[in-house]
């Protein structure tokens, strides 16, 4: 039995695919360039990014396994050369630079007109992967470590999310840059190295 998605979602899928193809040709290909004999695979990087953003946005899925399963079940007609979950996950993780570049371009492109260029707001918040008696976490071991959040008076194991945003009167700030760091790193050092 053929499983399909509604027409309005099909149009959004096409729009996302065309947008990602344009952005890939302009700049994203330089952030995930392939230097191998397999530089033109049957299942392209543009298709991986399209599935990731479309399913994440339309279906609100956050787990890569769920995104791949949805694509396998409902988007097979659109992506007949869909790779296995392991290959999809591996290739998506290798495109972190392209996702970072695409995010920064989208933040610049959709910047509201009422943003004040002369005033930016800088803030950070903890992303707690474990706290309490557990001294070490099992999530994101390569970047997570132990830190202290003075506003919550809390020792925790995890990461810090840093944001620089343009001030907007009467509205939440519009982010212009977002960065992750280990929990133990000083905010000032992160902003000097990552956000300036």
Task: Describe every region a protein language model picked out.
Residues 1-196:
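Short alpha-helical elements
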């Amino acid at each position: 039995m053929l499983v399909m998605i509604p027409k309005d979602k099909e149009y959004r899928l096409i729009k996302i695919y065309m947008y990602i193809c344009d952005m890939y040709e302009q700049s994203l290909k330089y952030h995930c360039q392939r230097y191998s004999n397999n530089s033109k695979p049957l299942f392209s990087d543009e298709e991986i990014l399209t599935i990731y953003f479309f399913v994440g946005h339309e279906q609100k899925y956050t787990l890569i396994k769920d995104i791949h399963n949805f694509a396998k079940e409902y988007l097979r007609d659109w992506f007949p050369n869909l790779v296995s979950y392991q290959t999809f996950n591996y290739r998506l993780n290798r495109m972190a630079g392209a996702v970072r570049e695409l995010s920064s371009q989208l933040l610049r492109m959709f910047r509201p007109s009422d943003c004040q260029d002369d005033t930016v707001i800088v803030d950070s918040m903890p992303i707690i992967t474990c706290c309490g008696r557990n001294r070490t976490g099992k999530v994101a071991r390569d970047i997570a470590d132990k830190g202290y959040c003075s506003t919550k008076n809390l020792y925790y194991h995890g990461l810090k999310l840093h944001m620089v945003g343009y001030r907007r009167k009467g509205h939440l700030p519009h982010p212009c840059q977002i960065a992750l760091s280990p929990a133990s790193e000083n905010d000032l050092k992160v902003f000097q190295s990552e956000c300036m």
